[in-house]
């Protein structure tokens, strides 16, 4: 039995389900009323220990501060019962610190090198602040006439 199989065998169903959840970082702070910000956590029976089984955090705010992200990862890792690291994800559709035109605009240039450069810069900047997963590049193939403009 390999390491992954052993880990999955040790994990409860609740822990496995929590790995598929993504939250904002403030749920890990003690000075925030989680129920007023994230909905009915009590009704859903979400406990404090469940937070340290959650798979992904989406730091919409303070995304440029690698120290905040690193501290959050350390706090999570120390309290995760199985030593599973926290994934950090963010929308990096057209850059992180360096902002490029949206993908639709870059495609209008017919310049593949510009497209490659923009995603390469976004990847380097994301990695530098501790982001593991970027929701980009993306292609919204919208065929609904109610959606006149999309990225």
Tell where the protein language model's regions lie, with residue ranges.
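N-terminal beta-rich core of secreted/periplasmic extracellular enzymes
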Residues: 1-151
């Amino acid at each position: 039995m390999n390491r992954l199989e052993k880990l999955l065998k040790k994990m409860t169903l609740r822990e496995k389900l929590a790995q598929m959840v993504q939250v904002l970082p403030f749920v890990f702070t003690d000075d925030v009323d989680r129920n007023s910000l994230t909905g009915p956590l009590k009704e859903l029976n979400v406990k404090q220990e469940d937070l340290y089984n959650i798979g992904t955090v989406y730091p919409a705010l303070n995304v440029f501060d690698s120290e905040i992200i690193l501290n959050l990862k350390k706090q999570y890792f120390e309290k995760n019962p199985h030593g599973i690291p926290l994934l950090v994800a963010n929308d990096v559709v057209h850059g992180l610190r360096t902002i490029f035109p949206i993908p639709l605009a870059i495609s209008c240039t017919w310049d593949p090198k510009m497209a490659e450069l923009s995603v390469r810069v976004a990847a380097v900047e994301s990695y530098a602040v501790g982001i593991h997963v970027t929701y980009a590049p993306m292609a919204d193939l919208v065929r609904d006439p109610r959606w006149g403009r999309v990225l």
